[in-house]
Amino acid sequence: MSNLKEIKRKIKSVHNTQKTTNAMKLVSTAKLKKAEEAAKRSKIYAQKIDEILSEISFQINKIVHNEDDVRLSLFHKKEQIKTVDLIFITADKGLCGGFNIKTLKTVSEMLKEYEAKNINIRLRAIGKTGIEYFNFQKIELLEKYFHLSSSPDYEKACEVIHAAVDDFLNGNTDEVILVHNGYKNMITQELKINHLIPVEPKSIEQTHNSLLELEPEGTELLEDLMKTYFEYNMYYALIDSLAAEHSARMQAMDNATNNAKARVKQLNLAYNKARQESITTELIEIISGVESMK
């Protein structure tokens, strides 16, 4: 009888877990739809800015005639890289499968790679998971940002990227790289590594088939465009990461719900078998008692 009570207790416990994971799956699905729409809208805008600034990087000398202009450094890779700033995004919350693992593994590998080349790498961490991971590894973080990956904010994104750009312009770092696990589709996330600064041309073909004409008076436009480019790339990465996080959590909770269903089914079979054995044992005892009284 005690065995039956224990199995029944387990069934109730797993069933409650199933309800919780299913509810979390539904919440993640609803949030994913909103995040997916926001990511798609932002991607179109970010890509267009990226295309324009990439084209400008081919024709930068037409705009900026002073070789000492600090803006030129944003378009030219330094011959010797001594310091690299790495901005990476992880989730603030758990229960999202292997979503954070890809990013943390990549950042760890990049750390080893740059250290092997005697290049100093400085980490700017966005998201509680990544911050706690590297704190546990006793690896110093230059900047820590909580609650930004779960609630993307444009002004906060600007604060993050402005600090990195200022460090680059002041000579404190030679390159800025942005790493995050992005949204590909409902069931797939895609690790993205964006070499943000210096700005590099994405396609040489653009120099041959350019429809963009630039004038010397375009220096003000260039400055505004660069500012928007850096800010929006940072903001888009946050939105893209959040959509991927909801996608990963939806999958993780769906798997957990299915596993709970399978476990309940197994426990029900075990309960019925144990109950049948208990009834059989009782019948045998009754029959034996009757026989002994004859």
From Swiss-Prot:
Keywords: ATP synthesis, Cell inner membrane, Cell membrane, CF(1), Hydrogen ion transport, Ion transport, Membrane, Transport. GO terms for biological process: proton motive force-driven plasma membrane ATP synthesis. InterPro entries: ATP_synth_F1_ATPase_gsu, ATP_synth_F1_gsu. The keyword Cell division does not apply. Gene3D superfamilies: 3.40.1380.10, ATP synthase, gamma subunit, helix hairpin domain. Its main location: membrane. HAMAP family: ATP_synth_gamma_bact (MF_00815). Belongs to the ATPase gamma chain family. Produces ATP from ADP in the presence of a proton gradient across the membrane. The gamma chain is believed to be important in regulating ATPase activity and the flow of protons through the CF(0) complex. This is ATP synthase gamma chain. The gene is atpG.
